[in-house]
Amino acid sequence: TWLTFMKNRLEIARDLLSPDGSLYVHLDFNEVHYCKVLLDEIFGRGNFQREIVWRIGWVSGYKTAAKNWIRNHDTILFYTRQNLSFTKEYIPYPEGYVRRDGNPPEGEGYAIEDTWNCSEIDKLDSIQIKSFDQEKTGFLTQKNEALLRRIIFSATGEGDIVLDFCAGSGTTGAVAHKMKRQYIMVE
């Protein structure tokens, strides 16, 4: 079954991770809840860090034919092996931005949240795969380079190893290479 397939790979991933290593698992609504229980069993509930909601598209076309709520997001579960090692990323404040009280902003910018958008309207935090984009491969579980760059940036440094057990078209390896990470891709 699918859970056995996942269990075998997740146990190997846990054993390969360094103490400050992390794991990100992309799932849709069909399997996310089963996989969360499995990950809690393998990594320990205390090592669950965050559920990231990735809005995957716009509500249009065939999606509107759904008989109930229209699905418009996938989930990425974020776990650590033992110690959290995380590089926080910020979206810079727009030029000329001032706070409500009239003072200039403090800090590096807007901290990226755990809901990642794919909307052209929300330029601030948009990670999208456009329908006719060259980056679109046709894989149902495709992640674009911006999404993978965000994950790899937050979890690794130059020279670290990135592993993808479901490498598909190889986008994870391409992004890891551009970011000067080592990578292992399995399909």
Kindly give the residue locations of the regions a language model identified.
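Class I SAM-dependent methyltransferase "Motif I" SAM/SAH-binding loop
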Residues: 166-170
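Conserved SAM-binding loop of SAM-dependent methyltransferases across substrates and taxa
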Residues: 171-181
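Conserved acidic carboxylate
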Residues: 187
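Class I S-adenosyl-L-methionine
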Residues: 1-161, 165, 184
